[in-house]
Amino acid sequence: MDSYFKAAVSGLDKLLDDFEQNPDKQDYLPDAYAFNQCSVSSESASPQLALLSKDQRCISTCASSEACCEDANETFLEGKIHEGLTSRPNEKNVAGLDLLSSVDASTSDEIQPSCMRRCSKPVCDLISDMGNLVHATNSEEDIKQLLPDDPKSSADTLITLDSSSVSEALTVSSVDCGSNAVREEQNNINAGIKNRDISIKELGVKVDMALFDSCKYNRTENLKDKIISNELETVDFDMPSVLMEQSSEMSNTKDNPQYKRLPCELLKDDGCLAEEKVAVAVNNTECLEEGGGSNTIAMPCKLPENEGISPSDPASKDENFKLPDFPLQENRTSVFMKQTVKEDSRNLDLKDNNDIVHVSGDDVPPSLSCLSLSGSLCGSLIHNNEHSDILPPNESEGQNNDAVTIHEEIQKSDVLDGETDLSKKETCRSIFLQPVNEKKGEGKVEVEEMVISGESLESPEDASSAAAAGSPVALSAASVPEAPGPCEGLTFPSSDMDGQELDYFNIDESMRSGILISDAELDAFLKEQCLSNSNTMSAGENVNDSQLQMNQITMKGLHDENAGDIYFNAEAGAAGENGGVGNCETSDKENTENNGLSIGEKGAIPTERELSACQPDIRDELPVPSIKTQAVGGARPKQLLSLPPGTRSSKELNKPDVVDVPESEPCTANATAVSTCSADHIPDSQVSFNSNYIDIESNFEDGSSFVTANKDSLPENKRKESLVLGQKQPTWVPDSEAPNCMNCQVKFTFTKRRHHCRACGKVFCGVCCNRKCKLQYLEKEARVCVICYETINKAQAFERMMSPGGSCLKSNHSNECATDQPLQETQTSSTPSPTTLPISALKQPNVEGPCSKEQKRVWFADGILPNGEVADTTKLSSGSKRCSDDFSPVLPDVPTMINKVDRTHSPTVEKPNNGLGDIIRSEISQSPTCHTAPVERLPGNTGTEGLPMPGPFTLEDDVFVDSEEPSTPTVVPANSGLPVASISDYRLLCSVAKCVCNNISLLPDDDIGLPPLLATSGEDGSVPVVQERPSHEQIILLLEGEGFPPATFVLNANLLVNVKLVLYSSEKYWYFSTNGLHGLGQAEIIVLLQCLPNEDTVPKDIFRLFITIYKDALKGKYIENLDNLTFTESFLNSKDHGGFLFITPTFQNLDGLPVPRSPFLCGILIQKLEIPWAKVFPMRLMLRLGAEYKAYPAPLTSVRGRKPLFGEIGHTIMNLLVDLRNYQYTLHNIDQLLIHMEMGKSCIKIPRKKYSDVMKVIHSSNEHVISIGASFSTEADSHLVCVQSDGVYQTQANSATGQPRKVTGASFVVFNGALKTSSGFLAKSSIVEDGLMVQITPETMEGLRLALREQKDFRIQCGKVDAVDLREYVDICWVDSEERKNKGVISSVDGMSVEGFPSEKIKLETDFETEEKTVKCTEVFYFLKDQDISILSSSYQFAKEIAVACSAALCPHLRTLKSNRMNKIGLRVSIDTDMVEFQAGCEGQLLPQHYLNDLDSALIPVIHGGTSNSSLPLEIELAFFILENLSE
């Protein structure tokens, strides 16, 4: 076995010598994939090693062997770290013997990691760790200079390969968690730099060393008391600017030849260099109590098993690094495995380094640093989700996803050797390096400045936290000739970034609540967009729960001449780039366990920071493009990066919290990003995105460059990108090539039909293609997708703004198209985009189809018939359908976030998750061309409803995870900080459920105790507080104080009562109003109860009344207008109080009263003797009360202790019409039937739609008498009133205005057919009590019955036969009366008034409920096209079926909906012969798209099944309420 390693070492020596002697001959070398990896995964060991070149496979094998062979030998280094050491791997590809397979020929190599199948130590680490830390320089003398002065340490820490001295640069930064200062220790061995005397506690660092010459892999040596020169720099985050500069002048000047030539330097044809410097993140895995902190020290030979990497840019301002001219692929994943820490030994066990460097070039094998990502990517910080194949699942939960962020997490978990005594958990946050200004010139890119911000978090018990930030430098901004560019990068002080962190790492849930990211940071990532003319390499592969994914970054073809000023403002959340010809596509995804990042064809991925911290909520499987990549020479990919077509599984895990940036945050020139997309280079394959992968096809044409976009370039690019849409007919994508929506990926089914966008020609679903826009080539409006619609509108709006004449911009046809929008902050956005509101999931009518067939009665909006044929849509009409756009409100209360992407629509919605305040973001894109655009979040506040309440969102019906305990910075918890818009707002109940128990009555059993008090100031942002058992004195002080809002009592979790002392009609009254009865289908109740003199206690019996009403409503017994509720016991300390009569206020004065939302009723206290009239003829009692208290038609006040207005039943006509004893029968009352009496004539107006009620009266009445009760007429100016005096019933009139009466209303009419012809009268009409009596002959009665049956008008002449001039007339008229129900009621869907539309209660056989909550459908509104059309029984049955289906669809989401203040939901369904659609909303705002998707699946079968049984057109709206389950 030793011979193999010796042979490998010998071969490596020759390669290094040859490289040094012939550095210029590498221009013709073939492509190579240079990996450096120590695999501990059960699947990735052999495949990944196969990708390595021969020398690096030897490195990996040696590292694994060393880890297996050594068990007890440890090397301790006390003192300071060597920094500045450089090492270089051999960049040549060596084809030859696979050393790993030769050393161990067992068949389990493919599935067993090398260190696991041998022993717990690596076989050899003399070379493997060298690949981790590559510092590319251009000076051969630097090798010798960088060697440590101390020969012993040099011999033990560095591996000398003959004359080729390979050293490693190791940068370790220590974060002082107490002061949030980052102490960066950098070791420069050679230079005579002055050292700072900083004492550091001794740390035992286990260093596995290998004797190179003898290849004995068990050599260890203790290095003690080695004082090595180093530098320590501290970053103070409180300073306005934090520029970390190396004090090492030798690495910052051009004069020093230290970085002139190293073997890993890449010399290209033009002599340019690709240089990178590496920093290694070292986990602080040890806590030392001494000194309050400790520093973790790592030797170059082995790297700790860390969760992330900390790359940095070159340490010299003049050190030039540039991207090669040829297409360059860089795929790297640095994974530092977690390590086992034994606190008692204070030893840092440095496990194998799992750093994978993937280098590929078409012409020359480039030399790439493992970690210097920002340099190689023009300063763009790469989002690199570090998930290693080689770790068990429990060791990768908190891995760092950002290339410049160090996230340490040491927790108790099983590690490779079974040790489980990890106890500390630390997080070093946001050590953030980024080039802010880069200069271009002579084909070289110089980094001028770097900004670093950091923050350290640690547990209180942690002693220290150490993190490595690789050579974080702030290069001096020396005056350097600047090449002209569109825009120069700006220098942003790190104080702008205090307290922020990159979110590309996974954090334990215990730490997650402290992680806050700026609201603007999602938009701030650098977005570039490009077209690819070659294959895209899809990096990473999915593994199951026993494996974790190896992430790689593939990069192709970045021209160094074009590598230019890309900068990033972390606070303002701005990213800039030049739209120009260069295109770059970037799609940001996040995942905590499986995540990869792939850039194809000259793409650049900037640092991505989520302003909304969106977490993917997407389908489990997504199609993967089949893209193959050839590797020439050396190690071959073995299909690791080029996966076959198939599906990938994605998991949904939590991401960090976010916060919003201040409203005053300035937007700099880089606050906008523009990208152009050339449609000429669209490949056939589509790019698939999911939470694990970002496969980006990009292409830089000649002259393209990465430059920042200035303010002037954005509008011009915007116009050019959008003008192409609609100017000529697009290429029509065949239906056969689009099984899924090309935007949201929804699969097309029988009900989810295809829709072609007339602007881009792609195929979308009805949700993504529901807009209409006028296109030039059609010269008329046509269906377009939401993306094209947005693009065209934005361009036109901008042109109108920029053009003095306001004319639309016109230009020549171009193949460019984009929809990138300027960044708009949440606080400053005022006008939503047309695409920001979710639209109905069903189809829209009047859309031109691709071809035509014969006309059918039912057809889908895209012209497809149910039998699969295509309908001629031009011959069909949509009737009187209202477009769903008409219902779109201006300001959504539940905002959605739309990521406007050209041709691909990536809606995102904030969603609370798992009580940690995570905001879920879903993005699924599939299109040959993809753009990235800033996310625009819309404001959600309407009126005083302060906060935007996010709603869960997803793109698939079957993919959604409800959050159970939402708590986010943007979502106020249910019982804290909830803005109170009004005491009558039904959403106020959302804050109560968690504060009280689930009893149906919270009234204390004693006579004094009051229910809990919900205290709130009533102002926006006030915090409701529930107080148990408030005192009466406290309530009186609260109610009598001026300016105080009503006191709100909690009767149960579903019912509130507002109490206030008011002056009404110059008297003092207790005012009670309920809030919550709407949820049961019951109108809210108000009571104005007379306040007795010196009364200082709240009348508790009113609370009992409301509890009784609530319980009756639960049973389906509702109180409506002129209904009553009676008592059998004493009420309000009086046995004379018999109950309440409830009326609907009409002409009464309600000024100054905090009335609830409509509908509501007013309860009037009645006496026991008045109960019979309240039961059999309540209108008489109501009018009598009005006459008594001089109110018209009735008072709203309840007077205690008054005398009854009616006594014992005397001789009244009602004895003939109603049963005043047993209440067995009563007067038939027809709603909206009015009786108007004027001088000389009377008119009985019967609504035509009440014909069925009239027929019931005729059939139930006897042969000679027809009696009908009337309704109160608001058209009359007075009304007849019956007054009982001394047992005699007399007639009075009560006037509304006090003016002379013209039209007087009556309460009933009686037709008596017993008048004899011999009486000499044609007919007699007279006023009896408060009604009209008409006596007619039997012949006239028959004529009246016939006229009523035939719905014809009928006139009765009254008077004597011979007195023609004195006759009066009684006219029976059928009228088209206007519906006056639902006054003041508005729709929950869009805020539209439903006044005048009929409605009825819905009683479902069963309620849909969970363990805690219930969804209840209470009412259905009928939007009749013709007011005379009566409601058919089939319509009601259809409404019930819809209610059942909707309740079932909403049931799984009840908790989330109510947590987001959506406890009242409206569903509107519209059906016509050629169209079906529905809309769902809450408080006038449409629901998030996810619920529409769920409703789509549930409602479509019911809707299509009901179309054949219902009369069309039909439009109904159902009201749903979410209630708490209460117990008796």
Swiss-Prot record:
Keywords: Cytoplasm, Endosome, Membrane, Metal-binding, Phosphoprotein, Zinc, Zinc-finger. The FYVE-type zinc finger is necessary and sufficient for its localization into early endosomes and mediates the association with PI3P. A zinc finger (FYVE-type) spans 735-793. GO terms for cellular component: early endosome membrane. The keyword Phosphoprotein applies. Its main location: cytoplasm. It comes from the Eukaryota. Zn(2+) 1 binds at C741, C744, C765, C768. PROSITE patterns: ZF_FYVE. One of its GO terms (molecular function) is zinc ion binding. Residues 649-658 have a biased composition (Basic and acidic residues). Residues 821-838 have a biased composition (Low complexity). Zn(2+) 2 binds at C757, C760, C785, C788. The gene is Zfyve16. It comes from Mus musculus (Mouse). It is found in: Cytoplasm; Early endosome membrane. CDD domains: FYVE_endofin (cd15729). This is Zinc finger FYVE domain-containing protein 16. PANTHER family: ZINC FINGER FYVE DOMAIN-CONTAINING PROTEIN, ZINC FINGER FYVE DOMAIN-CONTAINING PROTEIN 16.
